[in-house]
């Protein structure tokens, strides 16, 4: 048997070699423990270094957001199925703030507030991830609003115009057509999208907060049928979602829009509606035991909406001249616009369109109350042609409303007042539009020209809308060059106005009203006097009495 020899030098060199090549790896991980959970909220003990609004990882791939940082525990909002979170489970820090994937592949898709597709059409390839809480553009990074955002709705484009980069509030009671106005505005961007011009194209985002699933499906179907879904992203947080997801949905939508805005593109974003976001945030704050304020809302509910809506802007040329236009929606109760959340959002936005339930129920749709609706951008967001034909429209309608209320009590009116009432009734008919029927800007100009210049005065009120649609079709057939000139120059020339006026007078001669008569104004006929009514004028002269 061979003798076993041990070399101490070899053993020493082997140990030295191992020690010299050894690099100790130290890992440090903060782990917290769930102390209690319920209603989409979890309290976590531990995590001393956690940051505010940091993403926390719960078991089962569920995430939460750290909201309350207290001495002994952290209050977190759970983003997902909170019933799977149990007391005693471990919670880990991620070291990241909440972000969503963004990119052009989101067009035509329906996603949740975390950017995950929920339409069953497969995964979405993201260009990058964008944090939800980002600073809005500063004052020097912005420029004034000067480009019109055509809605295709005559009542808005004529009296409360919206510009690219503006925040225009849609406010009113439930079931007054707020969502319809917003969806029609999205549909109206189809012509710009099909033009292929990046300066005209508008990418649209519809954020549904706390809506019924059937309502969201109806909006998606309307956009699909109109061919508008290909340039629209739907961010859905339905009523069945947790308060945390409803709270985050608007920020997710604006992050997707900001990605395009900073690339120099134009974006339209609809928040439907911010009342439900405020209610979800109120629920979160009360569950986290934050002190309540007016109407039980937390003290920072104004900041909740202001930091969201300030992200809508028209960027300066140095920043790429992109824009993001916001259409926030607020639901009122009993037409009360002086409540807490409505007054907050009114003070943040650049104007509001108030939709009144009384007008809606009377058949005036869209039910926009011109009296308290306003756009603080004004004429700078209108093309010259619309500004020319609607100069005094808002004042005329306000006077019509006042006179209409007065005429309900007056037994006799003078001819001027009657003419004003007749003109006002026809203007109100011109401003009516059906759902899903936005008009191109050149047809808006022609319709408003007919109403404001008195060319509909001889048309019966019940026939105004039929006359309008048939006349627009007639203009397309016979004077398409006038309409194309309005689109190209954005102006209504004197020759164009004369052509429209002359064509309207000719068209009225061939238009038949519902009573079977011609719409052309009839010449007043002089009535012949009867023989016994004809009398000789007599002159009586009083002579002074002769002097005596």
UniProtKB/Swiss-Prot annotation:
HAMAP family: ATP_synth_alpha_bact. It is a peripheral membrane protein. Disulfide bonds: none annotated. Produces ATP from ADP in the presence of a proton gradient across the membrane. The alpha chain is a regulatory subunit. It is found in: Cell membrane. GO terms for molecular function: ADP binding; ATP binding; proton-transporting ATP synthase activity, rotational mechanism. Keywords: ATP synthesis, ATP-binding, Cell membrane, CF(1), Hydrogen ion transport, Ion transport, Membrane, Nucleotide-binding, Translocase, Transport. The keyword Transferase does not apply. This is ATP synthase subunit alpha. It comes from Saccharopolyspora erythraea (strain ATCC 11635 / DSM 40517 / JCM 4748 / NBRC 13426 / NCIMB 8594 / NRRL 2338). The keyword NADP does not apply. Its EC number is 7.1.2.2. ATP binds at residues 172-179. Coiled coil: none annotated. SUPFAM superfamilies: C-terminal domain of alpha and beta subunits of F1 ATP synthase, N-terminal domain of alpha and beta subunits of F1 ATP synthase, P-loop containing nucleoside triphosphate hydrolases. One of its GO terms (cellular component) is plasma membrane. Residues 514-531 have a biased composition (Low complexity). The gene is atpA. Belongs to the ATPase alpha/beta chains family.
